Amino acid sequence: MNETSSYTIEEVAGLLKVSKLTVYDLIKKGVLPAYRVGRQMRVDEEDLKQYKTNMRMSQPIAAKEAPKQVQEAEPDGRPNVMISGQDISMDILSKHLENAIQETPLRKYKGSLNSLIDMYQGKCDIVSLHLYDAETGQYNAPYVKRILTGEPFCLINVVLRKAGLYVQKGNPKNIQGWKDLKRADIRIINREKGSGARVLLDEQLGLLGVNPADVVGYGDIVTDHYAAASQVSSGQADAGIGAQHAAHMGSVDFIPLIDEQYDIVVLKKNEQLLKAVKEILNSEDYKANLSHLNGYETKLTGKVILET
């Protein structure tokens, strides 16, 4: 380890006893935060420790080889269950579900809105959501009702968490809330279209009457919370949008601005799958896995939010 308390990719691979390709895969998925120094990627010691702690607690399948595509099927021709969503809680759910249904679920790492559209098109069985609707002040239900037209569904809470802004340590630009993002001296790092964080930002800018074109950095995109936090930590942006849990691993300060509801939706026609998911979410084992993670609140975990 060097004097800055960080590791090269080769060193991380050696410590984890995996290949460099596996380490790059973890970084790409946002499971392991990293940043660039010149042409070299580095991983902070504390981030590596946190990753190893999360692995011991949950052993999520996200840390294994890249997931198979949705088109793949088991030998008997029956397709695997597909879970779409980027949060580690979905990796933990996948592991529990594998034991419950004796089948390895496939994982798709897509944003909330894009995943919901995939479900409508028959490409996903379980979709995680954190989509804020400014008109109603609600999370998820308004979007699910609009998009899953004619499809009876069950919307169930997974966790409650804080969403807001990542800022550099010490908050040198004195960023306090959404309105500060229109300042000319503030550069943000944005999220991809269809992600819950992008929807949250766009809804908040709309409430303030701010034109996205006036926000410096609005067109700069990353595809997960950890990458957003890493961009802020490295000084490439002054603020990023995301959930609290990534701030700890991304070595940034966090400004909480809204209580976020992270839910999953399952179509009711998948009766056995829905039954298994409800049992897992209400189990003490699953809640215990989540309670060990930074910034996760489980008081509503397993509660049915809406069903049609």
From Swiss-Prot:
Transmembrane segments: none annotated. Gene3D superfamilies: Periplasmic binding protein-like II (3.40.190.10). GO terms for molecular function: DNA binding. InterPro entries: DNA-bd_dom_put_sf, HTH_17, PBP_domain, SinI_DNA-bd. It comes from the Bacteria. Disulfide bonds: none annotated. NCBIfam families: excise. This is Uncharacterized protein YvgK. It comes from Bacillus subtilis (strain 168).
